[in-house]
Amino acid sequence: MTATPAPVRLRAVTHEVERGHDVLTTFSADGFAWVHAGTRIAASGVVARVAPRDVTPTLEAIEVDDPIGVVGSGPIAVGGLPFDARRGPGALVVPARVTVDNGERAWVTDIEAVPVAAVTGPEPPSRFSVVPAQSRDEWRDMVSRALARIGHGQLEKVVLAREVVIEADSPFSPREVVTRLISQQPGCFVYATEGFVGASPELLVRRKGHDVE
């Protein structure tokens, strides 16, 4: 029997090095190098190979420890793309090690795979109950009143939330909730902030003149 590899996540750690460090010592035969004016970038190893359209979500999924905090620090994707799109979309690489000298500062970023088991939260609840805060009749009444107000021109749009109360024998892990929402609601915007977790099918913005909020 072949064991299933443990799931992993990627973690990137960036640390500053002295300028004058030979950036190209990081470069390997199958690596990447970019030198222009005062900027030097060298990379080696591959932790992910991604299509251009997947670069942003791939980088955003990496846990980052980056005290440098400037453009180009932290994890990056590198590579070359075909000039003629008929030759294929091309692919970019997230390297295992990147050394950068931007003309003012120099740093090294290392990316490693970390077993998910090392960062998982507590065991999920073994028992829980879900109880609607409103009865079926109360919910129908809310819908009817909303439709009536729309019909009278008092509202153009209304979003009704049906509250439920969930009680469990142990705390829920926000990470587990987010993971399940991503799996069960693939077309939604999944979010979590300070214990407020959810999935929305739409992203709402409001424009005031030239400002969007």
Regions found by a protein language model. Name each.
Residues M1-E213:
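Signature of the chorismate-utilizing enzyme
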